[in-house]
């Protein structure tokens, strides 16, 4: 008999842990006592989700992957109180929530926000480099003592130009 593959996050146990946490938060809010800490198990599940999501093909090769994971974990913990263990569906029936899907979605969008932030930073950096090269080439003509030209090969210059052009086109489409 084939052994069933074990998931890195057991959704049933994760649901139980989140239900306990939410009950503790509700109890603390009603009595005015201190809020419970997020359990190690919940934190471990959130870390596993963020780490495994970062290994997907569309996120894997970014150089700022650690920042993406950190943002994902931070956002998941920031919105942990919005998780509802039970909700009412369209027919009026009570349905169990899915903490794995909830936190995966939060982390996914945190990754997208980090990528957008890093692309904007890279765009700014490349525009500064482009403007600096222009002004420095002008300086070279005026005075040969002030040569501060940044060296690029043809590939990197082409990549930078394409990146700037694509970024600006994307921004124009958003408007």
Predicted features along the sequence, with ranges:
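Short alpha-helix-to-loop micro-motif enriched in aromatics/charged/Gly
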Residues: 56-65, 76-106, 117-122
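Glycine- and acidic-residue-rich phosphate-binding/metal-coordinating active-site segment common to enzymes
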Residues: 104-107, 113-115, 135-144
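Regular secondary-structure segments
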Residues: 19-22, 73, 77
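Short, basic/polar amphipathic helix motif occurring as a linker/hinge flanking DNA-binding modules
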Residues: 117-138
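Extreme N-terminal regulatory/targeting segments of RNA polymerase sigma factors
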Residues: 1-67, 135-175
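Glycine/charge-rich, flexible interdomain linkers and switch-proximal surface loops
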Residues: 71, 92-93, 127-132
């Amino acid at each position: 008999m084939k052994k069933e593959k074990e998931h890195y996050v057991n959704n049933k146990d994760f649901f139980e842990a989140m239900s306990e946490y939410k009950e503790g938060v509700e109890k603390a809010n009603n009595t005015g006592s201190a809020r419970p800490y997020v359990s190690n198990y919940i934190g471990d599940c959130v870390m596993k989700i963020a780490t495994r999501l970062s290994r997907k093909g569309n996120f894997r090769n970014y150089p700022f992957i650690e920042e993406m994971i950190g943002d994902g974990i931070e956002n998941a913990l920031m919105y942990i109180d919005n998780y509802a263990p039970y909700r009412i569906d369209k027919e009026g029936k009570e349905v169990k929530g899915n903490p794995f899907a909830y936190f995966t979605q939060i982390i996914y969008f945190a990754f997208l926000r980090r990528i957008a932030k890093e692309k904007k930073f890279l765009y700014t950096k490349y525009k500064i480099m482009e403007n600096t090269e222009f002004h420095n080439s002008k300086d070279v003509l005026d005075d040969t003592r002030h040569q501060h030209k940044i060296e690029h090969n043809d590939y990197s210059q082409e990549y930078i130009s394409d990146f700037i052009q694509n970024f600006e086109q994307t921004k124009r489409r958003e408007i």
